Amino acid sequence: MDDNYFMKLALQEAHKAFDKGEVPVGVVVVTNKRVIARAHNLTEVLNDVTAHAEMQAITAAADMLGGKYLNECTLYVTVEPCPMCAGALRWAQLSRLVYGTPDPKRGYSNISPFLLHPKTEVTSGVMADDCSDLMQLFFKQLRG
């Protein structure tokens, strides 16, 4: 089980979002090579601008662990987190972030690369083409 394996699981979640008409972002949270949370965007379904996949996954993982910190966890997400989600990941003290495709317009790294916890290790570009292709397909269909 490597980064590609877990990113494929995150992509499965992104496809669930796509099927619901949500921006197709998916997440899995892993500790000790075990998935403890899965989530996808639910902003439209819940009518909640904060219901990003990362936020849903942070809550689910914390519930599973019985505590608010994810300092022994890796979060796999198909698209670079926005500043809101990066800030939440900082507060959760996430150990490692792995994302697929960058988000030049809304990603945290272009707005404030220091939003994540100083100890959070970041890996980007895992299955980037697959992640990017799904986003492009979604917005192409949305715009007709």
Model-derived segments and spans:
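Short beta->alpha transition motifs characteristic of CBS
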Residues: 36-43, 119-121
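Helix-adjacent hinge/juxtasegments
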Residues: 47-80, 84
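Small-residue (primarily alanine) positions within well-ordered alpha-helices
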Residues: 10, 14-17, 27, 37, ...
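Short secondary-structure boundary/capping segments
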Residues: 27, 66-67, 112-114
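Zinc-dependent deaminase
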Residues: 1-20, 32, 81-144
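Residues that line or immediately flank small-molecule/substrate-binding pockets and catalytic motifs
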Residues: 43, 77, 101
